Amino acid sequence: MKFEYCAAIRTLGTAGDKYYQTLLSLKQQTIPPKKILVYIAEGYPLPKETIGIEQYVYVKKGMIAQRALPYKEVDTEYILLLDDDLYLAPDAVERMYNGMTNNSGDVMCANVFPNHEASFSEKLKWIFSIGTFPMKSNKWAFKIRKNGNYSYNNNPKNGIYESQSAAGACSLWKLDVFKSVHFEDEAYFDKFRYPIGEDLLLFNKAYQRGWKVLVDYNLPVQHLDAGSGHVKAVEERVIDNVAILFLIWHRTCLQSYGKICIPSYIRRILATIIISAILRFLKRGNVEILRWQIRGLKKGIVISKSEEYKSLPPFADK
């Protein structure tokens, strides 16, 4: 059967030349998309950059809202989900499809943020700041631990690995698989200014529902990193980030695996407090951060007990 797909880009229309590079990359694919669909947030003007064949659809603004869509415009078996600041080599999509089918996958992801290539000092910073650890594995690209943090393969010798999470910038899905994940049920997280971890929610939900998520370390896809250029006040950002990460742990771990996850999360919190206290003692960190982290944790706990949050459908209910 002939492989056909539609490309779906989420954007605010502000990525400029990086967005144009994304469009041009799609046009130059060895297997070009049947449609290039651009889902732009309501209230934003259409980008001036164009290749003349893309179709625009206005949708509600949000990292999840602009991804968790019914995709009524898609009339192919496969859908390529993209951010608006990528370069894809001409054979990238063809390789994604071949890798997916040859490994019996349901979704194929490009590893656009190569953690394993970071410097030793950067990896050490991730361990102490966000609890992200390197790991050795012949099977997994990323694993989600019981405390809600992820571990990454520190020495991927093979190109393609199974995964429990992935970067969301570039992924090829079977459309029916994506719809079955019901990512729209996670739109609650768009209430926050910027829902960090939304890609973890998407791919871990697919994994927990029995779908085979793959990551290819050799795909020629480059993240050009347009960014929004908008940064919240540090205090608000820290509080929100801690609250979001608590809720992601609550949703992906506690709800799915039960109380066995609680000791791991407590150890994670204690480690965060100890590290913050040490930095405060050494006067190398903002003395207010620990207080903000505690406020963020309290905020997350309060939200987890709200009727609106408790009414969300089960995370791993297939």
Which functions belong to the PLM regions below?
Residues 1-25:
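N-proximal low-complexity "stem/linker" segments adjacent to membrane-targeting elements
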Residues 204, 208, 212-288:
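Active-site-adjacent helix/loop segment of glycosyltransferases
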Residues 166-168, 189-204:
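Acidic donor-binding loop at a coil-to-helix junction in glycosyltransferase catalytic cores
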Residues 24-33:
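Short, acidic, metal-binding catalytic loop of nucleotide-sugar glycosyltransferases
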Residues 58-74:
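Glycine-rich, basic loop-to-helix element that forms the pyrophosphate-binding segment
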Residues 91-136:
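Conserved donor NDP-sugar-binding/catalytic core segment of glycosyltransferases
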Residues 79:
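Short aromatic/hydrophobic "clamp" motif used to bind/position activated sugar donors
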Residues 63, 144-145, 152-173, 194-195:
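A recurrent flexible, glycine/aromatic-enriched loop bordering the glycosyltransferase active site
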